[in-house]
């Protein structure tokens, strides 16, 4: 990504969007260089031409839902039928937000500076452990601020609702598409 003259932050976002496969990164960088034709790198412009990984698209859609911008999310789900991917991602995001909110209710204050946050995260990393793995601090850092749009109790009940919806879809009690659509409506109804 240094060939494009991008900031470290934009380089990280670009890798997050296109994936970590070195061959794909090389191809995407070539495509971007040709597209820019010597102009400055602008991430929003580049997003239009890169081949974005499905996981990143789901992450973006979930972020839209959690920030109360659901029209794009509903369109995405209608086109792609990625209901379970979005459900699993919502579950993970809401669970992490609940943990952040709980720590803040206990008086913990997280820095808005990433380098300071990384050091703070070491103290709480076990709390965020999922399936035996500690997430990268940046993954948790990106959730800071979004959790403020929900009460701690709402986050707790939404985490439980995600689990219920997944269980009921898997046991055949609920139909996938309307169940996830209704869950999204529940989430936005809790938005402050």
Predicted regions and their residues:
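C-terminal alpha-helical interaction modules of replication/initiation AAA+ assemblies
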Residues: 57-66, 70-192
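Long, charge-dense, solvent-exposed interaction surfaces that engage phosphate-rich ligands
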Residues: 1-59, 64
């Amino acid at each position: 990504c240094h060939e494009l003259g991008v900031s470290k932050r934009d380089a990280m976002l670009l890798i997050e969007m296109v994936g970590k496969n070195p061959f794909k990164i090389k191809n995407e960088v070539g495509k971007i260089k040709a597209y820019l034709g010597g102009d400055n790198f602008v991430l929003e412009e580049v997003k239009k031409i890169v081949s974005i990984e499905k996981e990143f698209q789901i992450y973006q859609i979930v972020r839209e839902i959690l920030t109360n911008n659901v029209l794009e999310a509903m369109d995405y789900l209608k086109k792609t039928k990625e209901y379970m991917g979005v459900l699993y991602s919502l579950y993970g995001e809401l669970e992490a937000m609940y943990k952040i909110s709980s720590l803040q209710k206990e008086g913990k204050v997280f820095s808005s500076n990433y380098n300071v946050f990384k050091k703070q995260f070491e103290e709480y990393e076990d709390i965020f452990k999922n399936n035996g793995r500690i997430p990268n601090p940046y993954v948790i850092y990106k959730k800071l601020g979004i959790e403020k749009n929900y009460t701690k109790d709402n986050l707790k009940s939404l985490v439980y609702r995600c689990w219920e919806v997944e269980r009921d879809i898997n046991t055949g009690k609920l139909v996938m598409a309307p169940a996830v659509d209704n869950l999204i409506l529940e989430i936005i109804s809790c938005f402050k």
